[in-house]
Amino acid sequence: MKILVINAGSSSIKFALFEKENLNQIASGIAERIGIENGIISISFDKKYQFEIDMKDHLEAAKKLLELFEQISLIKNADEIELIGFRVVHGGIELNKASKLDQETISIIEKSAKYAPLHNPGALQAIKAFQLALPKAKLSVNLDTAFHSSIDKINYSYPINYELAQKLGIRKFGFHGISHRFITNKLEKILNKKSVNFVNLHIGNGASLCAVKVSKSIDTSMGFTPLAGIMMGTRSGDIDPSIHEFVCKEENMSIEEFTSILNKQSGISGVSQISSDLRDVEEQYAKGNAQAIFALDLYSQKIADYAAIYLNKIAPQIDAIVFTAGVGENSAFVRKNVISRIKIKNIELDEALNSQKVGEYQLISTKNSEIPVYVIRTNEELMIASDAKKLNS
């Protein structure tokens, strides 16, 4: 029997397929351009497949996926898919752990859509589509916000008018929780400890840090939205909120237009004026491009600043600093540049270990380092599949 993991947006469905018994991933892929002309379904199985198929909505995409799974002999029939686990960005404050999918859970996700208008609606469309396409399957959800439900009031509150904050539900929610939780569980196994204290640096195009104490999130850099925190690929991270008003007045721009700039044209892309892909910016850095050097130094400093704050929060017993996600796992340059800017402890990277390709995980610090530094590959899909299995065992 199989477990299907779904991560859906408004016009796409990313998926991964796992064997239920041993949780081995056997396939992955994406259905793109749902509701748009020239739809494409890509599947990686025994080889890479690509199909040009128009899909008018998520239900048609779900049905086409199942047909193609049978066509390429990934499954014999749809009944082999016993469990489906969905990634949902926002569960508000009510959904604080992976949950079986029932009408109450769906209602909470619908209610939380106002906090994640770009993400939750697509997930809901996919949930409803697979309920119809695979009526026998048992469904569960993992929330990106859930791991951060352990953050206390001091750390999740914003110093704005209290009545307004209460009325509108304005607080830090945090994101990337599935990844932060996966890394927490993995570090426990690596260190053979029942609980761990560490700072996790999930650095991809989107990026967030998490302070983990006794294996629970006590603070995280993203906030009410994923725009908060450190500088990212295209997102600004933290800025003075009055910049909004100033730019809108000076440029005769709407709040929505400037918020879009902060989300899509800022960060590494906006500062470097080169690309949101760090590899391109690193290449220009090596060639002495002044704007690339400035962008990467600013980026590294923003990450180091948050890391230092979080090391202070989890002290005195600090088990590790962990780098994960696309940049964290693959950029030796960024890891070195960030660690060199953290001065509160003597943290030393082993140049050779930091430079080599990382497998599942790698210790990259020296024996003299006061805090061990690891690179650990994250696997959100495996976390979702594992939870789906546990919830339905």
From Swiss-Prot:
Enzyme class: transferase
Domain of life: Bacteria
GO molecular function: acetate kinase activity; ATP binding; magnesium ion binding
GO biological process, alphabetically ordered: acetate metabolic process; acetyl-CoA biosynthetic process
Record-listed substrate binding positions: 87
GO cellular component, one term: cytoplasm
Catalytic activity of the protein: acetate + ATP = acetyl phosphate + ADP
Its EC number(s): 2.7.2.1
Pathway assignment: Metabolic intermediate biosynthesis; acetyl-CoA biosynthesis; acetyl-CoA from acetate: step 1/2
Function summary: Catalyzes the formation of acetyl phosphate from acetate and ATP. Can also catalyze the reverse reaction.
NCBIfam families per the UniProt record, alphabetical: ackA (TIGR00016), PRK07157.1 (NF005520)
Protein name: Acetate kinase
Species annotation: Mycoplasmopsis pulmonis (strain UAB CTIP)
Gene giving rise to this polypeptide: ackA
